A protein has these predicted regions:
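Bacterial Sec-dependent N-terminal signal peptides
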Residues: 1-25
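N-terminal regions that are enriched for targeting/export leaders
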Residues: 25-82
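Active-site signature of cysteine proteases
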Residues: 26, 217-464
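Post-signal peptide N-terminal segment of secreted/secretory-pathway proteins
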Residues: 70-140
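Second-shell loop/turn segments in exported
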Residues: 78-90, 152-158, 305-313, 322-323, ...
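Stable alpha-helical elements in mature extracytoplasmic
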Residues: 88, 96-97, 101, 163-172, ...
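Structural recognition of the beta-strand scaffold that forms the well-ordered cores
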Residues: 94, 120-123, 169, 178-181, ...
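Papain-like cysteine protease catalytic cores
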Residues: 118-248
């Protein structure tokens, strides 16, 4: 009897513990009375409250002292033509990567304008990512359902976001076609509904693969049947990728230069022809991790038989050196950043002085870049194409930069965004640069073994 009483008392004590903790850590009536004094209801509070009832915070926080447009002159600028538009999709990584190649092709062949088919590469991106997920499920079939990697796979079966490794892997494997050989469709421009159905199907297929008891050969046959269904659905949504096509090349005077039949691979080899897998490196400014080290993100790739995302972490000033060298040589770069921070979309500027949130809210915001990353307050969210820098003649230091965006020509400054150098320091994260612009000491860093980071590391979400 004594034992039963003791157990009952212990259960009562355990049951009361959360309530006790809640009482100590909760907002009491006295605390509420005290903190409510912060709102004084004076003329200043009333004016701000009235304004916030009828207008957005971003509009009211616009800094009147910074309303003048940033000077649009740049000392060095890559020659480009035209602005692309990813519409309502997360394909910025693809547009940025192809825009780097597009600028080179327009300049080299004196084209009036040109776009590669983003839809063509996107078709294979989605097919390859579906295979990546399904094969990942097969590879982890011996792990429990609550294993971190299994949970991550089912939480992230598919995305339309990505990064430059996807561009290099997919273009190398499947080639390229002009935009008119496989034009955009409603589903490529508006990916949400298509992605939702694919993710639902992948999760169902993933469960089937995990519960299957067959041999590896049988599992691979199941996966192939699943991919057959997915290929059909992608074709319904995006169209079927061309096996061959005819392309008429004209110069900037609109004179026909050639008319020729191509395959996607022969078109890529003739007009791009560079080794995307080995000619470029990715550098990153992540102040939370040690500089001078190479990092690899496990399972962060677009193609199962491709390679993981690999980068070297560098101080921002070293990254600027390479960016300036590339721009001066008329070569655009894949660039990614936390684009929404302090962005004036109407003017097309990224400037720390665009908005004065502190005066409006009464808050102070003092976190540095490292602290923002560590607390999930900042991270790379969008990829664009770095095309210009303005260097001060006296100091030799950059004053501002310009990126070609993929939100259409009506967005920002003629389809571009202009950023101050101070904004670059705080919110730039990744740059992909050709090796010929990279100093020897940085190239040597890639000879060391990379530090392997897990796929679920919060710093490495896909760029959209």
């Amino acid at each position: 009897m004594r034992r039963i009483t003791t157990i009952f008392a212990a259960l009562l004590m355990a049951a009361s513990l959360p309530l006790s903790l809640s009482a100590q850590g909760g907002i009491s009536a006295d605390m509420l009375k005290e903190i409510s004094k912060a709102y004084e209801g004076n003329a200043n509070d009333k004016a701000i409250r009235n304004a916030l009832n009828t207008a957005s915070i971003s509009v009211l926080a616009e800094n009147a002292e910074n309303m003048a447009m940033i000077d649009t002159h740049f000392s060095d600028e890559v020659r480009t033509k035209g602005i692309t538009d990813q519409k309502s999709s997360g394909r910025c990584w693809l547009f940025s990567g192809l825009n780097v190649l597009r600028a080179k092709m327009i300049d080299k062949y004196d084209l009036p304008s040109f776009e590669f088919s983003q839809n063509y590469i996107f078709f294979y991106d989605q097919l390859e990512k579906c295979n990546l997920f399904l094969q990942g499920i097969i590879d982890t079939r011996g792990l429990s359902d609550d294993d971190r990697k299994v949970d991550w796979l089912f939480s992230n079966p598919l995305s339309d976001g990505g990064q430059f490794t996807g561009v290099s892997n997919l273009v190398t494997k499947y080639g390229l076609v002009p935009s008119d050989a496989m034009p955009e469709t409603f589903c490529s421009n508006n990916t949400s509904a298509m992605s939702s159905l694919l993710k639902l199907k992948l999760r169902e297929d993933g469960l089937r693969l995990r519960s299957a008891k067959g041999s590896m050969k049988q599992l691979l046959a199941m996966k192939e049947a699943m991919l057959t269904e997915i290929y059909r659905f992608l074709t319904l949504c995006l169209g079927e990728p061309p096996v061959s096509f005819k392309w008429t090349r004209c110069n900037s005077k609109d004179e026909i230069v050639s008319v020729k039949e191509y395959t996607p691979k022969s078109f890529y080899e003739e007009f791009v022809g560079e080794d995307l897998e080995n000619n470029y490196i990715m550098v990153m400014n992540d102040p939370c991790r040690e500089y001078g080290k190479v990092y690899e993100i496990d399972y962060d790739r677009h193609v199962y038989d491709g390679h993981n995302w690999l980068y070297v972490n560098l101080p921002v000033e070293r990254i600027k050196e390479m960016a300036i060298a590339s721009i001066k040589d008329n070569t655009a770069m894949y660039f990614s950043c936390d684009v929404a921070k302090f962005m004036d979309r109407n003017k097309g500027t990224l400037d720390l002085a665009n908005f004065d949130y502190e005066s409006l809210s009464g808050f102070t915001f003092g976190m540095d870049k490292s602290e923002r990353v560590r607390t999930h307050a900042s991270g790379s969210s969008h990829a664009m194409t770095l095309i210009a820098v303005d260097i001060d003649a006296e100091s030799g230091k950059p004053v501002k930069w310009m990126v070609e965006n993929s939100w259409g020509p009506a967005s920002g400054y003629k389809g571009n965004l202009i950023m101050t150098d101070e904004w670059f320091n705080e919110y730039m994260f990744r740059l992909v640069v050709e090796k010929k612009y990279v100093p020897a000491d940085i190239l040597k860093m890639f000879e060391s073994d990379p530090v392997l980071l897990p796929a679920w590391d919060p710093m490495f979400s896909p760029e959209n």
